[in-house]
Amino acid sequence: MVLLDSLGKRVNFLNAVIPELGLKEIRAVHMRAEDGGRAPEFREKFDCAAARAVAPMNILLEYCMPFVKKNGHFIAMKGNAEEESYENALQELGGKVELEDVFTLPESDFARRIICVKKNHFLSTRYPRKAGIPRKSPL
C-alpha cells in the first residue's frame, strides 16, 4: 500500500508511525498526485485508489485515475452536498460510477457519500495534466 501526500510534514509523520504500529508493506511518499500519476513506478499500477474530499469530484478523478489499473477502482469519500457535474471527467478518464452510497458516520450528524468508479480503459498520456492545471481548468 502506498500513501501519497503533497505535504512533507504529514508524510514524515506517517513514516514515523507506520513502524510503530507494526504495519507491513505500507509506505508514505511525498509527491503531488499530478506528478505521481505520471511516474512509471505508480502509473496504472494499483487495483484501487482512494481519496478523501480534498477537491471537487472532477478534479479528484484526474488526480486519482492515473494510478488505477484498467478494470480497477477509484473510491472517493465526499460530503453529501450537491456537487457540480463530473460526467465529462468520467468520460475523458475512462471511468464509470458503479456505486454511490450515502451514510452517516457513527456519533456524527454529518452525511457522507462513497462513490466507487471503475476504470474501463487505459488512460491517455495527456493525463494527469501538470500541477495546478486540474484546479485552474477542470475537466
Q: Language-model segments: what does each one mean?
A:
Residues 34, 56, 79-83, 105:
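Short "lid" loop at the C-terminus of a central beta-strand within the Rossmann-like core
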Residues 87-139:
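SAM/dcSAM-binding transferase cores
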Residues 10-12, 82-86:
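Short alpha-helix immediately C-terminal to the canonical SAM-binding loop
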Residues 68-70:
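Helix-to-beta-strand junctions that scaffold the AdoMet/dcAdoMet cofactor pocket
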Residues 46-66, 75-76, 80:
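A short SAM/SAH-binding and catalytic strip from SAM-dependent methyltransferases
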Residues 1-53, 61:
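Conserved SAM/SAH cofactor-binding pocket of Class I
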Residues 25-27, 73, 96-99:
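Conserved beta-strand segments of alpha/beta enzyme cores
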Residues 6, 79, 119:
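Cofactor-binding loop segments of dinucleotide-utilizing enzymes, especially the Rossmann-like FAD-
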